[in-house]
Amino acid sequence: MDYVRTQVEAVFDDSEQDGSTISESGSCDSSSDRSFADELGLMELLEGDKAHDLIYRNCKSGLGDQCQILSVLRNGFRNVGSRAKLKTFQVFQEAVQMKHGGDGGAKVKYGWCSVSKHELKTIFEYGFSEPLRNDGSFGRGLYLSPDNSPLDCLKDSASESEDGMRFLLLCRVLLGKSEIVPQGSTRSCPSSPEFDSGVDDLVSTKKYIVWSTHMNTHVLPEFLVCIKAPFNLTRSPKRLRSPWMAFPVLIKALSKFLPPSQILVIQKHYKDQQNRRITRSELIQRVRSITGDKLLVHIIKACGHKVQH
């Protein structure tokens, strides 16, 4: 959903300053960016899409203000090759489930993998290949960070462009039964058929290790997040987060104070923003001009606590 923080200053000021939406960033407004996504078989997700908003908030929480999230794209599995990869993943998921007796052994998680722009086409067309973008300290394979730790993945990468563009793949990872892999390992496959993947720690996992023998059957790239980040990333302290509320909920609350004619205008502006005819900044300014900040502050403070996450 299209979330609005319950502090009106944060809603209106932060979104204009930090480029917090796809449209404002300019990342996917040009024909070249659209052709880039089309070439990879990806579909841009807009604000209001559930997957977009979950990924955006997860990234924003994990990366902080030092990174600018430019766009979120989903693998559409449009061509024969990508659909075959999806089917392959599903077949191996069933096989792992059968191997472990159907007792939940086919564990699937989401994990982050940092890639360069020139690697993207190869990965989406042919799959992962070596050499991989890791230090090899846990053996030969693909290392992914848990979905709540995008910064760990991003810190392992280096921006190859002057503008600081980074690319993160959010992948479905078929972990199955994991074993601990000690640092310094030189293995490229599980220690025995009992195991399907590796981790650095079973309790506090920072790395998923998918062996080179498994990385094109047990990893399925599903989302691509384009990020602009400084060369030297730091683990910034987590900031206090204000509660959020859905924009449609805000419109519903405004309908108790504004005449129907003004609500219709706000709904039209919101629809225009969803269809990318206007940017989020323009939507915000137009809503403010209709309601005034005083009414917005009152409604958001009164209603925001009901939709905290």
UniProtKB/Swiss-Prot annotation:
Induction conditions: By salt stress and light.
The record, for InterPro entries, names: Poly(ADP-ribose)pol_cat_dom, RCD1/SRO1-5, RST
For the RST domain, which residue ranges apply?
238-309
List residues of the PARP catalytic domain: 28-255
Q: Which domain of life is it from?
A: Eukaryota
Keywords from the named record = Developmental protein, Nucleus, Stress response
Q: Where in the cell is it found?
A: Nucleus matrix
Q: Which is an annotated GO molecular function term of this record?
A: NAD+ poly-ADP-ribosyltransferase activity
A single GO cellular-component term on record = mitochondrion
Name where it mostly resides.
Answer: nucleus
Pfam families under this entry? RST (PF12174)
GO biological process annotations for this chain's record? cellular response to hypoxia; reactive oxygen species metabolic process; response to salt stress
The record's function comment reads: Probable inactive ADP-ribosyltransferase that may be involved in stress and developmental responses.
Quaternary state and interactors = Interacts with dehydration-responsive DREB2 proteins and a number of transcription factors belonging to several protein families.
* Name of the featured protein: Probable inactive poly [ADP-ribose] polymerase SRO5
Gene that this sequence comes from = SRO5
